[in-house]
Amino acid sequence: MPLNVSFANRNYDLDYDSVQPYFYCDEEENFYQQQQQSELQPPAPSEDIWKKFELLPTPPLSPSRRSGLCSPSYVAFASFSPRGDDDGGGGSFSTADQLEMVTELLGGDMVNQSFICDPDDETFIKNIIIQDCMWSGFSAAAKLVSEKLASYQAARKDSGSPSPARGPGGCPTSSLYLQDLTAAASECIDPSVVFPYPLNDSSSPKPCASPDSAAFSPSSDSLLSSAESSPRASPKPLGLHEETPPTTSSDSEEEQEEEEEIDVVSVEKRQPPAKRSESGSPSAGGHSKPPHSPLVLKRCHVPTHQHNYAAPPSTRKDYPAAKRAKLDSGRVLKQISNNRKCISPRSSDTEENDKRRTDNVLERQRRNELKRSFFALRDQIPELENNEKAPKVVILKKATAYILSVQAGEQKLISEKDLLRKRREQLKHKLEQLRNS
């Protein structure tokens, strides 16, 4: 690089070496190698991007079995997997082998969907779409199944195993199906453990006439009606013929757990009020149920005037019984008075207006009398006799001074009166002496 000559302190070769793994020297990844080999048109880049993140479905697989014909998976798969009459649907494979391989690959997802709704129904397609969106698409599963079937078929041809006997129509005979059913009956799982509710409205399940018959596809309404009509009924097993597989101890325990769960879910219907009234009537005799306690009635009654939600928490004290009774009676009287006031709001308003009017009149009279008394006091004071604008404080002060002066003059006059009386007494006594002499 030419920059290495001008900048000696900076070694750009080392920098290039550090970032060299991020550059590709005329080497481009061939994303379309598989498509070119298969002579297909290369897809859009968006599809390749999604293909990089594509995940194959990996649900938990059930244990491998000899044949899947005796399990409900065959019944469900037969309803949406048609078979041709000319090639038997699988070339050198029997229908039982094909079903076993498909069931092991798919993990029973499509089989479980067939129990819920009809495969031809639109809801079944929607359910498949929803389920496959969770597992990254249905196309990957279909492609994987086709590749696995091709590999199994090639391995079967290489091994040179003879093909099973076929009937006149190109399909395996019914005796082979029945033989496979009876041979693998002990290895199958009881369908009642997986699906406890019966598929039809009748009390007993109808056995299929032949393995080629379509599966039962009950609607949701029939399932709900059967579940509601018999919530405590024992689950009915599903099968292709009259023989039911033997149940082990684990199966019986699982059935008991299912029954217990159904009992928990079931809602106990209470006795209607009419029947309760009949049972509580005197005609029922000694067997009649006692009526509800008053505590229940008290709880049902919700007073709206006894609790204030905006108030702080109350700090009530435990009073004696007598005091509590008095308080309760006082509360009742207060409630009655409040109710009376609330009953006639117009009368209370008129009473308040009348009372206010009378109070105003009395207050006016009191003020007028006080004013007249002040005027009279002012007239008695010589200094303020002609002063009409004299304030009340001046009137009171002058009146006090005038009263004190009047009291002092009174005492002086009383003392003079006493002196004059004594003088009179002396003069009278002297006059008497002059008369007698």
Curated annotation (Swiss-Prot):
Alphabetical list of InterPro entries matching this protein: bHLH_dom, HLH_DNA-bd_sf, Myc-LZ, Myc_transcription_factors, Tscrpt_reg_Myc, Tscrpt_reg_Myc_N
Cellular location(s): Host nucleus
MF GO annotations: DNA-binding transcription factor activity, RNA polymerase II-specific; E-box binding; protein dimerization activity; protein-containing complex binding
Biased composition (Low complexity): 207-235
Highest taxon in the source lineage: Viruses
Other notes: This protein is synthesized as a Gag-vMyc chimeric protein. The sequence shown here corresponds to the Myc homolog fragment of the chimera.
Name of the protein described by the UniProt record: Viral myc transforming protein
